[in-house]
């Protein structure tokens, strides 16, 4: 039975660049991923704070299977999913903290978003799209309509809400516009929404 499982779901390595740094990520390793991702992002910002930089920090959490570090286990009062959300929130806060520490926050666009709604086949421990209908894998609003937070003190007014529709594919042309970077020559589907 274990060999059949491995054929369908082989062990997942941890890769940095093109190098496998951990060939078989254990459950304990996954408990530490959010902290490790955060530490690496903070370290990158520290090292590159004197020049323009781009950090893309996608978390593997809150995708199932869910794992959380000991510092956040049982802390949210909302079960494992809540604990994982609390740790991801902490991670975003750490990145914002280092931006403030080096006075980079007024010259940095910080974006926090999701790629899809909750996995409904995992029950209530995978989140909720309420009040929207359905979740991941559907074309209903609960599956494809996601929140996005953008933080840029001095440029984006605090507590402002944009109700214009946009998609994550719009991030590349928008960021390129803001940074005066050249877009690829081939056609892309996104649009500058600034």
Residue map of PLM features:
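Short, solvent-exposed loop/turn and secondary-structure capping segments
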Residues: 1, 25, 65-72, 121-128, ...
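A long, amphipathic alpha-helix that forms part
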Residues: 32, 36-45, 69-108, 125
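Acidic, His- and aromatic-enriched active-site or binding-groove loops in soluble protein domains
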Residues: 1, 85-88, 130-136
């Amino acid at each position: 039975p274990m060999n059949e499982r491995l054929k369908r779901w082989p062990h997942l390595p941890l890769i940095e660049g093109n190098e496998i740094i951990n060939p078989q990520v254990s459950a304990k390793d996954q408990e530490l991923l959010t902290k490790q991702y955060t530490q690496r992002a903070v370290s990158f910002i520290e090292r590159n704070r004197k020049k323009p930089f781009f950090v893309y920090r996608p978390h593997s959490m809150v995708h199932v299977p869910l794992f959380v570090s000991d510092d956040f286990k049982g802390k949210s009062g909302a079960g494992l999913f809540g604990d994982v959300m609390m740790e991801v929130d902490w991670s975003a806060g750490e990145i914002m903290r280092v931006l403030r520490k080096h006075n980079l926050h007024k010259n940095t666009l910080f974006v926090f978003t999701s790629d899809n709604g909750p996995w409904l086949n995992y029950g209530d421990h995978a989140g909720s799209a309420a009040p929207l209908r359905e979740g991941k894998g559907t074309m209903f609003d609960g599956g494809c309509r996601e929140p996005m937070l953008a933080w840029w003190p001095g440029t984006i007014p605090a507590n402002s809400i944009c109700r214009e529709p946009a998609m994550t594919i719009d991030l590349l042309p928008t960021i390129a516009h803001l940074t005066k970077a050249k877009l690829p020559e081939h056609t892309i589907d996104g649009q500058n929404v600034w």
